[in-house]
Amino acid sequence: MTDYQGKNITVIGLGKTGLSCVDFLTAKKANVRVIDTRKIPAGAEQLDKSIPLHTGSLNQQWLLESDMIVISPGLSVKTAEIQTALSAGVEVVGDIELFCREAAKPVIAITGSNGKSTVTALVTEMGKAAGLSVGMGGNIGIPALSLLNENHDLYVLELSSFQLETTYSLKATAATVLNVTEDHMNRYADLEEYRQAKLNIYHHCQTAVINGEDPLTKEDDKQSAQQQVSFAENNADYWLKTENGKKYLMAKDKLILACDEIKLTGRHNHMNALAAIALAQAAGIKNSGILTALRTFPGLAHRFQLAHMANGVRWVNDSKATNVGSTVAALTGLHIEGKLHLLLGGDGKGADFSELEKLINKPEIFCYCFGQDGAHLAKLSSQSQLFNTMEQAIETLRPTLKPGDMVLLSPACASLDQFASFEKRGEEFTRLAKLSVAQ
């Protein structure tokens, strides 16, 4: 544990995470000040009036007067004012680093371009089913520091590349980079810089769980995991066995469960299940808990979720597909009886969409593109139409639907150009799906 008493600490960014940092540091008797570049930041009304607050810009003087800066993951350490503070010898960390210095129980840490929320939630359910008190948080749900208020046996953290940039003391019992595909290219110089941020999760961990099908998830010499295990369809420690047309989840030579006994569907979710099993076993979670969770965990909202079905048409909400890799995962191995009506669009975050081209140029796939980067996506397929909004796209495709068709929202883009969040986008899709059937 670190002594923060009397230290001058500036927290950048309010919201749930920023407030959790303020609460933690004030309880440790630090002298806390808060900066938020928004003029009216979320959470300002919850901040104790005795805490100095500067809004609308980064206050360079406050930063230079600090012993430590706790930076919001949404702000890059490359920002000029932060670089000036670093050059002056000010320590810059994130909330996850504060958590790691304090946590006394084992941590399972999960990152990746796609699937990390599903795996985080599934591992959490495995631990709970085994009788453990599990704290789940980080980039999903509860801020990590808030988890310290409970007496948990195990922490399961979803971590973003942004959070990992300023995390140095993780020392996870088990950690994984599920996959690495282009995302946040408006923040990183290239894919390798993004990957290196992800790989920080392996520093000093006991077991690194790597994706045997994605060499970018393998630790470099810079990391120092005590041991490494892999998951993949074949030739891995955790793998899929096919026998008499059925697929089985395997841990080395031991059969865990048939894939048709788990609630998660699709090849990408079978990979997620293998990763979760590997992490859980590395952390000593009992097999009984692992099996129970696999049989009962239904998946997360907005992750390839059946939003509605009527007249033989399935409406599938995959609004969480905020990057190309996630949409590729949704489309790979997808089998439908009729036509696939694919909704694409939003803020592409500077990504290269070309990986989608081969997947969507099929006679049974029709693309309906919308939003900020809709025009770029529409160029990928000869069977594309361009719209301003998702609602306009759905109005157009509705009369063409026939039994056996699927309408899939898997946009390959962030939502913030037109929606408050990917959740709001998914909710609007679900509303329109049900309205579409009602009409």
From Swiss-Prot:
Catalytic activity: UDP-N-acetyl-alpha-D-muramoyl-L-alanine + D-glutamate + ATP = UDP-N-acetyl-alpha-D-muramoyl-L-alanyl-D-glutamate + ADP + phosphate + H(+)
E.C. number(s) listed in UniProt: 6.3.2.9
Pfam families for this protein: Mur_ligase_C (PF02875), Mur_ligase_M (PF08245), MurD-like_N (PF21799)
Gene Ontology MF term list: ATP binding; UDP-N-acetylmuramoylalanine-D-glutamate ligase activity
Keyword Nucleotide-binding: yes
Gene Ontology, cellular component aspect: cytoplasm
Domain of life: Bacteria
Cellular compartment(s): Cytoplasm
Pathway: Cell wall biogenesis; peptidoglycan biosynthesis
Keywords assigned: ATP-binding, Cell cycle, Cell division, Cell shape, Cell wall biogenesis/degradation, Cytoplasm, Ligase, Nucleotide-binding, Peptidoglycan synthesis
Biological process according to GO: cell division; cell wall organization; peptidoglycan biosynthetic process; regulation of cell shape
Residues holding ATP: 112-118
Signal peptide: none
Function per UniProt: Cell wall formation. Catalyzes the addition of glutamate to the nucleotide precursor UDP-N-acetylmuramoyl-L-alanine (UMA).
Record family assignment: Belongs to the MurCDEF family.
Protein name in the entry: UDP-N-acetylmuramoylalanine--D-glutamate ligase
The organism of origin for this protein: Mannheimia succiniciproducens (strain KCTC 0769BP / MBEL55E)
Primary gene name: murD
